[in-house]
């Protein structure tokens, strides 16, 4: 879906599978010159587990690195947002473009049209929940 107004195109790319409802929300400036925008960029993920089950949130490392590159290139703030549906909680991390996020290797669920459902070794980053801002929401 896209919504156009005078200056911006808002693109919400939905990955409607059991692992993630809203995969990416990307706000893109019309002329693709990001240097003078004051827009923040956010990656939105959903989790079916409880926010209290783990003390961190594991995300693909390339998603973190992409947010870091975008933040450096645009001089804008970038965020990772994780929606914990069952608890009605939102965890929000600001991704620091200068921080060295430590990757870990994890056997993770893999779901794609090109590969059978199953497990795959993936490079991930574990973001501590204590570093996130936590919000409650209502439907």
Spell out what each predicted region is.
Residues 1-18:
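Acidic-basic catalytic patches of nuclease active cores, encompassing PD-(D/E)XK
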Residues 24-50:
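Conserved catalytic cores of phosphodiester-cleaving nucleases, focusing on short active-site segments
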Residues 90-139:
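Intrinsically disordered, low-complexity terminal regions enriched in charged/polar residues
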Residues 68-99:
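Nucleic-acid nuclease catalytic cores
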